[in-house]
Design a protein with these regions (language model features):
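Active-site Gly/Thr loop motif
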Residues: 1-10
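Glycine- and aromatic-enriched mobile tails/lids
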Residues: 9, 15-37, 41-238
Length: 238
């Protein structure tokens, strides 16, 4: 029976507090005020560098409930927001229509998605190096240009799974770029992030989260948030 590594869980995620609020490192809304995240989408920072099996219950059951209660409390204290003429909504509508209007000369969604998967598997698999991760990052950033011309064959606006797959691919490229940038920045091995060019853990320089934020022009900025150590002190595993 052939056996190979596969993706089980994506560590990291949208930074939240314990109540699901998508706050920045200073504990204030940044980006979309009132945005909450829950479950395995969110990163509350409870798992360290490698989440163990079944510990997803902490994300889904405990913090899922806390996020729901937090969102309910926020909604009860804040008035309804009218998005009908919101610039953000209009921008999203234009993005959807732009994908539908693309000429049939670009890549199919499945082709571009496979190219992304191959590049990420090669450069950001189980064992990583600076060179390999940079090659993957360059490839993903090149795919962004190809994505602008990606072909959506179904031009309908109802139950259009081809359009959904195209939109998902855009989000995957965002995540792939973030994974590559974060991996290159973390010049150590920690948890499931294993670098052959930096094989040891570096608590002095990397006991921190690397937070990435995408700006309106597509630029990615980095922030850092220190790890809060309470009862259990970090030690070398022997």
């Amino acid at each position: 029976v052939p056996i190979r590594p596969g993706v089980h869980y994506q560590m990291g995620g949208i930074k939240t507090d314990v109540d699901g609020r998508c706050w920045d490192v200073n504990g204030v809304w940044k980006g979309v005020e009132g945005l909450f995240a829950a479950g395995e989408t969110a990163c509350v920072s409870v798992h360290g560098g490698n989440r163990l099996g079944a510990n997803s219950l902490l994300d889904t059951v405990i913090f899922g409930r806390r996020s729901a209660l937090g969102a309910m409390d926020y909604a009860s204290k804040n008035s309804h927001v009218d998005f009908s003429e919101n610039d953000w909504v209009n921008g999203e509508k234009a993005k959807f229509q732009g994908l539908l209007d693309n000429e049939p000369t670009g890549d199919l969604v499945a082709k571009l998605r496979m190219d992304m998967a191959v590049a990420m598997d090669k450069g950001l698999g189980v064992y990583r190096t600076e060179e390999g991760m940079q090659e993957a990052l360059d490839a993903v950033q090149g795919m962004r240009e190809r994505y602008k011309k990606v072909v959506v064959q179904d031009k309908g606006k109802a139950f259009n799974t081809n359009l959904i797959f195209a939109l998902e691919l855009g989000c995957m490229l965002d995540c792939a770029e973030a994974i590559a940038i974060g991996g290159i920045e973390r010049k150590e091995s920690r948890g499931a992030h294993s670098r052959t060019d930096f094989p040891t853990r570096d608590d002095e320089n990397f006991m921190k989260h690397i937070l990435l934020r995408k700006g309106p022009g597509g630029e990615v900025t980095k922030e850092y948030m220190p790890i809060v150590v309470t009862q259990w002190q970090p030690e070398e595993r022997k």
